[in-house]
Amino acid sequence: MNLKSIQFSRKTSGILASLLVGFSLTLTSCNDDDNPNTTPTPGSSTITDLVVASDQFTFLEAAVVKAGLTTTLSGTGPFTVFAPTDDAFRAAGFADAAAVSAAPDTTLRRILLYHVVGGSYPASAIPAGQTALPTSLSVNGTTYVSKATSTSGTGVSVNGARVITADVQATNGVVHAIDRVLMPPTGNVLQVAQADTSLSLLGAAVARGGAAVVTALSGATPLTVFAPTNAAFRATPYNTVAAINAAPVAALTAILTNHVVVNPGRAFSPTIVSGPITTFGTGSVTATVGSGNALTLLSPGNGGQVSTVLQNTTGVQNRDITATNGVIHKIDRVLLP
């Protein structure tokens, strides 16, 4: 499979702590937009001080204050904070800092704790591949940090959000600025898909597909699902719930499994490269990565027509949707085997 190497590891603080001594960061990204600027010199400010002083974290400052975390992030630590920029908050649907402050404090606290990891982890200490890091969120709080290297450099991401400024040092830890707000998972892949109204026809197809499909999408094995939207299904003979329920189960099962990747289990979009991807069973689709983070898929049964992995839009996340057992990317065409 031509995916950038992803190594799943639950050995977090033990492995990473042993790598911290003596490291300094030299990090080059795949393009200027993704290039993590680095500030390796130890700072004299706490994480809270850094957030307050920075003009790119005004939304985050509002969130920290509303969530009651200013004292925590000024504490001894050490902490690693994946800090969404103001642009990241805008992309999540917050118009300004006032809109952030108007959000429920319990909601903001849950989201922010999902960005805070115990321990100080500079980007240079993050192993190549994918590493599971538990956050300060007690329920469904694991994040997945990926470091992938190509001919043009090395990039670091967390749950698909790119690190755009790495290693801002504080007296009580380190801050990595990221380009997207991380949303904690609300359930497994099946539950997340069922709760999304734009994927209701996919939900009907899964139900028609039978216990094996349901078990796979709700099980413990990590997986990646390329999820056709309702519009994608409407362009096929399976364009209504009635049509789906009238379809042969075997045919639907073959189609559905062609959208599931189990190796690697969590393929976040920054880690996908051009080339074949083996789907569940013996199927295969071909990925093509273009400029501007464009990503398309080609399946043998689509007659040369590609399926596009949808870009995130303001207030709507379409790719790198995290579930407790995997990740979902919405696509605009059903992948026919």
Residues covered by each model-derived region:
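Mature, structured domains of secreted/extracytosolic soluble proteins
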Residues: 2-19, 23-337
